[in-house]
């Protein structure tokens, strides 16, 4: 009886030592924890195996069996973790395809470049260039002609301004001469009417008759 109790104590110490050397189960996300019932049943199986051997030589084989059993449990836990990881879809895969692929972006610069290229290729560029050159030449020649006309008109306008100023002075002089002549005629008429009234009236009648004859002939 004492021998059986000592063997059981030795087996418990060996299991605790082996169990402490194994990797911690808490690091596994989906590992199944070992309950007290599982531990007691595991101890009972170890004690039954040790009693059936009947000697202390079988302790090494029991320890190796326990280590192998723990390694198998760890491998099963790892397989279970891999299965759960594969079974649960990733969050990135749950996104719709429209969100991952927004579609092609409209390139404005590329569109403008293609449009210009098509317009140049479709038209005869050399003909357009020659037409532009001819148009530029015509515009330049007309511009020179207009400049010459403007210069001539400026010089002509200066001459006309000078003539106008001279004509204005001449007209003022003629006006003064006419006024002087009118005064002289009035003075002579008054003097002749007083000094020579008969001759003055005869001369006046002749002048009036001449005017009437001229009007009648017309």
Curated annotation (Swiss-Prot):
Keyword terms: Coiled coil, Endosome, Transport
Annotated Gene Ontology cellular component terms: BLOC-1 complex; endosome
Compartments (UniProt record): Endosome
Superkingdom classification of source: Eukaryota
Keyword Coiled coil: yes
Compositionally biased residues, Polar residues: 17-30
Coiled-coil annotated spans: 142-192
Record flagged with keyword Transmembrane: no
Main location: other
Start and end residues of each stretch annotated as Disordered: 1-62
Similarity remark: Belongs to the KXD1 family.
Assembly: Component of the biogenesis of lysosome-related organelles complex-1 (BLOC-1) composed of at least BLI1, BLS1, CNL1, KXD1, SNN1 and VAB2.
Full protein name: Biogenesis of lysosome-related organelles complex 1 subunit KXD1
Upper taxonomic lineage: Eukaryota, Fungi, Dikarya, Ascomycota, Saccharomycotina
